[in-house]
UniProtKB/Swiss-Prot annotation:
This is DNA repair protein RecO. The gene is recO. Belongs to the RecO family. It comes from Xylella fastidiosa (strain 9a5c). It comes from the Bacteria. Involved in DNA repair and RecF pathway recombination. NCBIfam families: reco.
Length: 243
């Protein structure tokens, strides 16, 4: 299959044999693709190598045969965000999440748009934690494993004042005992779950519980094996708060 003048976001790049690269990209029309960029060493290929960087928005042409395609041409369409600190780690996170959870060639229409929006939010570091929760919700929905965030697992409308455990398969379940502090820590309020369902920015105090709840769901779908970016973010936060 010939792919011509398609736009994509670069997710990951790694060496492939001696002079080539394996480039993972996210497209709206074809989903995630793995492309081999051959012979990219040398001064003449400097512009191409510069375009094949994570977060870069590109236009490319390729020949797709089997699992991996052959990249024929690529050019940068804008300047990729220059990130640092938590915003940079967040970019590693969304890219790693896509690579681990989204199979190649699967349809990703809405997820492509969500990635584009999240990329711009990373550029400004605007509501970073909230942006990541929205992206996580979108990736779960794309995979067909999302759930109704307006009602609990029994179909009862969520109570904003109640805390819920997010069951990876069935969705929100009411926390039965408020006295179990260990379980309470890993729950989300009905208020923040409703906000996530309705794209409404919630109270900042609710975001930590939502982060832990969504991570538990994602960890289930990751087969129990966590992400390298989670470890990097945890180390960064520890270093940032250390005396």
């Amino acid at each position: 299959m010939l792919i011509e003048h398609e736009v994509a976001f670069v997710l990951h790049v790694r060496p492939w044999r001696e002079t080539s690269l394996l480039v993972e990209v996210l497209t709206q029309a074809y989903g995630r693709l793995g492309l081999i960029a051959r012979g990219v060493q040398g001064l003449k290929k400097q512009t191409l190598r510069a375009a094949l960087q994570p977060l870069q928005w590109i236009r490319f042409s390729a020949i797709q045969r089997g699992e991996l395609g052959q990249l024929r041409q690529a050019e940068a369409l804008d300047t990729a965000p220059r990130l640092k600190g938590e915003a940079m780690l967040a970019s590693f996170y969304i890219n790693e999440l896509l690579l681990r959870l989204v199979p190649r060639h699967a349809p990703v229409n809405e997820l492509y748009l969500a990635y584009s929006q999240t990329r711009e939010r990373l550029r400004t570091s605007d509501s970073l934690a909230w942006s990541l929760r929205l992206f996580e919700r979108e990736i779960l929905e794309t995979l067909g494993v999302g759930f109704n965030l307006e009602c609990d697992a029994n179909g009862t409308p969520l109570d904003p004042a109640t805390r819920y455990v997010l069951d990876p398969l069935e969705g929100p379940r009411r926390l039965l005992s408020e006295h179990n502090n260990a379980k309470r820590r890993d729950t989300a309020t009905g208020h923040v779950l409703l906000a996530l369902a309705r794209n409404q920015i919630p109270n900042t105090n609710d975001l930590a519980g939502l982060r832990r709840s969504m991570r538990a769901v994602l960890l289930h779908h990751l087969g129990g094996r966590g992400l390298k970016s989670w470890e990097m973010i945890a180390a960064f936060r520890h270093q940032d708060t250390s005396p």
